[in-house]
Amino acid sequence: MLDTQYSQYIQHRIDQKTKPLGALGLLEKVAHQLALIQSQGKETAVEHIELNKPRIIIFAGDHGIADEGVSIAPSAVTQQMVLNFLSGGAAINCFCAVNNVEITVVDTGILLPVESDSDMLISQRLGTRTNNFANEAAMSLETVERGIELGTELVSRTISNGTNIIMFGEMGIGNTSSASAILSALANRTADECVGLGTGINNEQLARKVAVVKQGIARCINPDAKEVLSQVGGYEIVQMVGGFLGAYENRTPVLVDGFIVSVAAYVATLIEPSCRDYMIFAHRSEESGHKILLELLDAEPLLDLGLRLGEGTGAALAMPIIRAAAEFYNNMASFASAGVTV
């Protein structure tokens, strides 16, 4: 849990800027959260928010549930998109380039491994792909534990290399089915409420997707977060859960992307509730389950652009807002310094 001893001072500093109280809306909340995070363990509150080496980690993994026809694309597309990330051709590459965000791509277990000597690629494979959770557990509990550990360690290394704001993205054909099943099982919501169109499936595919999610969650008798990950999770989701826990352990904010990343964020809060304090929600996804997650996490997203791509695109697009929040906190004049009387 965040130490709030400097909260009042930080809010006073924001309120004394040359503007009406609250006039910068969500920017003020973001600035307050960032300043409070960066004041943890310090003798005084920070006067200057630092944003160093922002980085997005894209976790890629394949899903056995893809065999059930729950996506418009085959599993081979996961590998193809990883190659696209590495060559700089994806949407996330464009948005990171324009916003000065570095990219790491993690193979958590894709069907067709990528042969590349790119510095962007890290292999943390938990398997070839998950099992088909319509019929059996997606992975063992031991694999869940190992995946969380790998995600935590990767984020800790990233932070030790100078990054102090981090984002997660994901890629994996079938992963909206996994995320929907996790949400349904842990939040006690129906599959119909949690399942969305994903990559743009038709009504027949949507009905099939709901049916297989119901099959998977029928085995989720134990509401324990790790048990649910074992039954219906994905390798990339498990490692993102670990990533959120790693950011919490290192007192580092995470700019949270859309539906699938938010599912991982939710699971992380069930394991360690205090990690919620380090999350800033980038955008509101078009996926139906994301509204449920934002309510569960009491989150007010920065953007609402109708996005449903994934990859971390919403987080990268929100980075200029984060920079603007830091800039006004750091450099906007106070009434006293500007000689403005009100």
UniProtKB/Swiss-Prot annotation:
Keywords of this entry: Cobalamin biosynthesis, Glycosyltransferase, Transferase
Residue numbers annotated as active site: 311
Family: Belongs to the CobT family.
MF terms in GO: nicotinate-nucleotide-dimethylbenzimidazole phosphoribosyltransferase activity
The reaction(s) this protein catalyses: 5,6-dimethylbenzimidazole + nicotinate beta-D-ribonucleotide = alpha-ribazole 5'-phosphate + nicotinate + H(+)
PANTHER family: NICOTINATE-NUCLEOTIDE--DIMETHYLBENZIMIDAZOLE PHOSPHORIBOSYLTRANSFERASE
SUPFAM superfamilies documented for this protein: Nicotinate mononucleotide:5,6-dimethylbenzimidazole phosphoribosyltransferase (CobT)
Keyword Metal-binding among record annotations: no
Entry superkingdom: Bacteria
The enzyme's E.C. designation: 2.4.2.21
Top-level enzyme category: transferase
Pathway participation: Nucleoside biosynthesis; alpha-ribazole biosynthesis; alpha-ribazole from 5,6-dimethylbenzimidazole: step 1/2
Pfam families in the record: DBI_PRT
GO biological process terms held by the UniProt record: cobalamin biosynthetic process
Name of protein: Nicotinate-nucleotide--dimethylbenzimidazole phosphoribosyltransferase
Species name: Vibrio atlanticus (strain LGP32)
Function: Catalyzes the synthesis of alpha-ribazole-5'-phosphate from nicotinate mononucleotide (NAMN) and 5,6-dimethylbenzimidazole (DMB).
